[in-house]
Amino acid sequence: MPLYRARPRSLYSRRRRATNRRRRYRRRRLHIGRIRSKYTIFNVKQTQNISFTFFGTGSPDKNKWQAMSLEAVQSSGTSPKPGINLRFAVFGDRLPGTGNQYHYPFDYYMIRMVKVELRPAFNPFQRVRTQGSTYIDKEGNITTTTSGGEWNVDPYAAMSSRKTWSPHRYHKRVFVPKPTIQQGGTGTNIWSTWYTPGGRQLWLNSIQDNVVFYGMGMSLRQAEDTAAPLTVEATITYYIRFGQWTGLSP
């Protein structure tokens, strides 16, 4: 049997207490934990639905391509603008409250991630099967078509983030949106000329709750002899981060 040299116990060391053993003394009731972060952060998950209608009655012609973005649906009255913005993400299509205000008890926010799920809102057995494309564009310069100006080819065919999409089936895209920062000078462009790369984001003031975050484009080919409206439902899940709790009333 080997012999080991006895080691003296240090003056300040103690035996490790078993993890499953109860504490001998109660915790102090008046102990208040120190706030270690600069300001408290809250993560919120919100889901809203938008319906998009491709094509019209008798237009466009067969094999023409129509393209639109998530911001294609116009707002009705004073309700929030459908799309990727804080006001629509939190309140949906509800009208403003007292004093024509939308209130957030936080000073800052950022939209960390967005999940877009496309589903058919029509009977897939009664329509000719077709296909299209979805692509991610974070600067807002999304190619869209107007009535009578549809393309002969897919507008998003050359995009590196393009994925094939069939309106008869479920389709999902997940991306990190970027807020719109309009260019300076006398330009009339509304898309962003600068944004943080990768998964980084910027804190925005909650007062600017209608800033548009870009974005995703959708294209679809008209495959029937006579065009008819084709409605697609988009379920958008917003992952929002709020900072600096205030709790103040509007």
From Swiss-Prot:
Annotated region (Nuclear localization signals), positions in chain: 5-38
Domain of life where this protein originates: Viruses
A GO CC term assigned to this protein in UniProt: T=1 icosahedral viral capsid
Transmembrane parts of this sequence: none
Main subcellular localisation: host cell
Start and end residues of each stretch annotated as Disordered: 1-24
UniProt record, GO biological process: endocytosis involved in viral entry into host cell; viral capsid assembly; viral penetration into host nucleus; virion attachment to host cell
Keywords: Capsid protein, DNA-binding, Host nucleus, Host-virus interaction, T=1 icosahedral capsid protein, Viral attachment to host cell, Viral penetration into host cytoplasm, Viral penetration into host nucleus, Virion, Virus endocytosis by host, Virus entry into host cell
Compartmental location: Host nucleus; Virion
InterPro entries membership: Circovirus_capsid (IPR003383), Circovirus_capsid_sf (IPR038652)
Region (DNA-binding): 1-38
GO molecular function annotation: DNA binding
Signal peptide: none
Similarity comment: Belongs to the circoviridae capsid protein family.
Protein function: Self-assembles to form the virion icosahedral capsid with a T=1 symmetry. This very small capsid (17 - 22 nm in diameter) allows the virus to be very stable in the environment and resistant to some disinfectants, including detergents. Essential for the initial attachment to heparan sulfate moieties and chondroitin sulfate B of the host cell surface proteoglycans. After attachment, the virus is endocytosed and traffics to the nucleus. The capsid protein binds and transports the viral genome and Rep across the nuclear envelope.
Subunit composition and interactions: Homomultimer. Assembles in the nucleus, presumably in an immature form, then migrates to the cytoplasm once assembled as mature virion. Interacts with Rep; this interaction relocates Rep into the nucleus.
Protein name per UniProt: Probable capsid protein
Origin species: Goose circovirus
Gene that encodes the chain: Cap
